[in-house]
Amino acid sequence: AQFMVRNLFYNVPSRRKFIDGDNSRLSAQIKSEFQRVALCNPEVEFELRQNDALVYALRPTNRRGRIVDIIGKHIKQNLLDVEVDTSVVRIEGFVGRPEAAKKRNNEQYLFVNGRYFNSIPMQRTIVRAYERLIPEGCMPSYFIYLTVDPDRVDVNVHPQKTTVKFADH
């Protein structure tokens, strides 16, 4: 299947006016959402064009390959595999080597059941694990994929569906 989005907000004049103005923020949001979806679905081919300029042309690959395609070749040698399987959750993915930590926090991704989510407590836990390994003010890279029984996670906490709530049982 192929999906193409053109003339976004064509029928919504107030949104169209926003786009016709300074659209750099919107472009950044579209790119960010594209990256999240592409990182969750490495087996899918994706292409992103903005104003007819090719931004991404992603071929099907594995998770590591997709991370390299999105973030850049520099990250390839800095990814450490993570794999934990319990009766409650399966955790897979990659964390960055401590020496590759950066001041910017643009390489931190959490996914649950194929969906990107944001969790301040989980982010703090991951950063705390690096506490003595990285300079203060730096952030480690991480790409963590959780698989949980769908009955144990609620994705309807926030309209953007980026906040999730996990069941305690």
Q: Where are these predicted regions, by residue range?
A:
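N-terminal phosphate-binding caps/lids of nucleotide- and nucleic-acid-binding domains
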Residues: 1-169
